[in-house]
Regions:
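Short glycine-/polar-rich loops that comprise or flank the Walker A/P-loop
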Residues: 15-17, 49-51, 298-302, 325-328, ...
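C-terminal-of-GTPase-core extension/linker across diverse P-loop GTPases
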Residues: 2-8, 12, 141-263, 280, ...
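Short glycine-/small-residue-rich Rossmann-like dinucleotide-binding loops
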Residues: 240, 275-276, 300, 307, ...
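Switch I (G2) and immediately adjacent beta-strands of P-loop GTPase domains
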Residues: 52-64, 68-72, 252-280, 298-301
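Short alpha-helix of the ABC ATPase nucleotide-binding domain corresponding to the H-loop/switch region
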Residues: 251, 277, 285-289
Length: 454
């Protein structure tokens, strides 16, 4: 990492301020070539955490005013010498300032390269780096809080404490096995078992919160389904807060899938308003029905809508069959009209049924509560450690599996060496989670998801 990188760190759009970030051994010297300070002092003469007003020059011509902020290694985001040039936020202006920096010796940064350098320089671990991306892309307040908690080290501290328990047990076993003639007390089976179970319970707790954690950070694929004209599109509009789907009294109005991302309580839903499910001779409508069934298979959460003002028919019951063994909330719409639906049948078939009038906007609070309960986000504490990425889940499950093998080996009386192999494998999995022993390919994959400039 001897080279110096640069990129626009703010969105490329018109705005009040644009920031060009430069990081690397020669960052300050390169910035001195393009910034002439109002005071006449060079940036190289400034201490870290110092700002200087000046002008940016491209090919000896002033192109904008700026404020240059100097950070000296290791006290910077990347752990390297860093300069952030804040200029006016026009698209052309920021591109021209970046051009001046690149002409002066920096190279364009790759996607996520600033944060990757922060990771490689020990400024943050891999789980914290992933939290940076989650914080940037957060769409809900709970997701933002959870991402910041992870960035602030909540997950890292939890994993480190669990690793410490395992490493202590492993060291005691290794010492007793390697130095049998020394007066090292043998680690009792009960003590060893307690250590393994303590860590196992901690990992199980983390896994139990994974779905809820992922729901508030990444959002949930949600399908709105039902037969034609039960109010699916009206529900979509109610949750969206505006007319996203066309609503008419004509059955089969929605044929294609209409999508929208909305925040409902603590969770972000990626809604899909699907075509009404029924047998049809209309080719276009039939294609829409097939697409709806495919979306049901993909969905994590299903909102099944029924017309409360009409009796349940065979189409309704076929929809219930599609929902078997899935996370489903039954929504009885048109609660403003006299009820004719078999509510007892719905309640016996579905774990949760709520009543709304999408047309009148009634029942939204009850529906929000039902969604949060179904996803487990109603009880989640965003200040506590949680795993929110698939990579973290895989590492946690791998460590848990190794500990279960260790317990089995202990219970059947296998040697301490055999048990220790399982414990060491669990530690390896946890160290991969935090990135302390992650493979290069894993690290590259994590940072490939970042934007340039971060």
């Amino acid at each position: 990492m001897s080279d110096t990188i640069a990129a626009v760190a703010t969105p490329l759009s018109a705005g009040g301020i644009g920031v060009i970030r430069i990081s690397g051994e020669s960052a300050i010297e390169i910035a001195d070539k393009v910034v002439r300070t109002t005071s006449g002092k060079s940036l190289a003469s400034l201490k870290g955490y110092t700002a200087a007003h000046g002008k940016v020059y491209l090919e000896n011509e002033a192109i904008d005013e700026c404020v240059a902020l100097v950070f000296r290694a290791p006290k910077s985001y990347t752990g390297e010498n860093t300069v952030e040039i804040s200029c006016h936020g026009g698209v052309l202006v920021t591109k021209q300032v970046l051009r001046a920096v690149l002409q002066s010796g920096a190279r364009p940064a790759e996607a996520g390269e600033f944060t990757k350098r922060a990771f490689l320089n020990g400024k943050l671990d891999l789980s914290e780096a992933e939290a940076v991306m989650s914080l940037i892309s957060a769409q809900g307040q709970q997701g933002m809080k959870a991402a910041f908690s992870t960035l602030d080290g909540a997950l890292s501290r939890k994993i480190d404490s669990l690793c410490s328990i395992l490493l202590s047990a492993s060291a005691n076993m290794a010492a007793w096995v390697d130095y049998p003639d020394d007066e090292i007390p043998e680690l009792s089976n009960d003590s060893l078992k307690n250590s393994i179970v303590t860590v196992k319970n901690g990992l199980t707790s983390l896994l139990s919160k994974f779905d809820a954690g992922k729901a508030i950070t990444d959002g949930v694929e949600t399908a709105i389904i039902g037969k034609p004209n039960v109010g699916k599109s009206a529900l979509m509009n109610m949750l969206s807060g505006f007319s996203r789907s066309i609503v008419t009294d004509i059955a089969g109005t929605t044929r294609d899938i209409v999508e929208e991302t909305v925040r409902v309580g603590n969770v972000v839903l990626r809604l899909a308003d699907t075509a009404g499910i029924r047998e049809s001779d209309d080719l276009v409508e039939s294609i829409g029905v097939d697409m709806a069934k495919t979306r049901i298979e993909r969905a994590t959460l299903i909102l099944a809508v029924f017309d409360g003002s009409a009796s349940l028919d065979q189409s309704d019951k076929e929809i219930l069959d599609l929902c078997k063994d899935r996370d489903v909330i039954g929504i009885v719409n048109k609660s403003d009209l006299p009820s004719k639906a078999d509510i007892d049948y719905l309640k016996a078939t579905l774990s949760k049924v709520v009543f709304i009038s999408a047309k009148e906007g009634e029942g939204e609070e009850e529906l929000t509560k039902a969604i949060e309960e179904a996803l487990g986000t109603d009880k989640i504490d965003t200040s506590q450690a949680m795993i929110t990425t698939e990579r973290q889940r895989v590492c946690t499950e791998k460590a848990l599996s190794c500990l279960e093998e260790a317990l089995d080996a202990l219970n059947i009386g296998m040697t301490m060496d055999a048990i220790n192999v399982c414990i060491e494998s669990a530690v390896e999995a946890l160290l991969e989670l935090t990135g302390k022993k992650a493979r290069e390919a894993v690290v590259d994959e994590v940072f490939s998801q970042f934007c340039v400039g971060k």
